[in-house]
Structures are given as structure tokens and as C-alpha cells.
Amino acid sequence: MEAILMIGVLALCVIFLLSGRNNKKKQEARELEDYLEDLNKRVVQRTQILSELNEVISNRSIDKTVNLSACEVAVLDLYEQSNIRIPSDIIEDLVNQRLQSEQEVLNYIETQRTYWKLENQKKLYRGSLK
């Protein structure tokens, strides 16, 4: 009788130990899954940062033939496709501005075109000639 009781107690101890190990393995698996999820989030963040940096680099890269950045050349190509001529003064000023995005370049050119249009519409005051 005592032998059967001892075998039963040993069986319960073995089951308890195995279930404890199983719980530890489940806990470790959950921790590893959380760690993997955190690493995946970091990879996504780093990929976004890398793509933003690559975009900035491509916008800042200078075309050696015309001495303008890629975004400036793209905007000037849009004007050329639309058969709109840009005065050389605006292009010369554009070289010195070093604008970062195509929208900034477009806004700058439009502002300068408006300014030059107003300047060219000025007339000489009639009273100045005598």
C-alpha cells in the first residue's frame, strides 16, 4: 500500500515538475514573441528613417551639368513641358537658394515670376521726362 502511495506521490511530483517546465517554456516563448515584435517595430521605424534620408540625399544631390539639385531640375522640366519660359535671373537665384523639396522650388519660382511680372509692368512716370 505504501508503495502505491509513493508511486502516486512520485507521479504527481513528476507531473508538477513537467507542468512547471511547460509554464516556464510558455513564459519564455511569450517573452521571445514580445521581443520579436519589438524588433519588428524597430525595423519598420529604421526603414522609414532610411527612406526619408534617401529622399533627402536624392533631393540634395546636384546635377553637375546644370549645377541644380534633382528636385529643381524636375520642377524646371515641368515648366518646360508646359511651354513656360523662366527668366535666367530666377534660375540663377534658384541655384543659390538650395531649396529642399519640389513644392518649395515651385513656390519660389511662382513668387519670383509674380514679382518680375509686376516689375515689368511698371511704367515710367510721365512727369519725369522734360
From Swiss-Prot:
Q: How does it sit in the membrane?
A: Single-pass membrane protein
Q: Where is this site: Involved in oligomerization and DNA binding?
A: N120
Kindly list the residues the record flags as site (Involved in dimerization). R113, W116
For molecular function, the Gene Ontology terms on record are: DNA binding
Q: Which residues form the signal peptide?
A: none
The induction field says:
Expressed abundantly in the early phase of the viral replicative cycle, especially at early infection times.
Top-rank taxon of the source lineage equals Viruses
One GO CC annotation, please? Answer: membrane
> One Pfam family for this entry, by name?
Phi-29_GP16_7
Q: What is this protein called?
A: DNA replication protein 16.7
Q: Which organism is it from?
A: Bacillus phage phi29
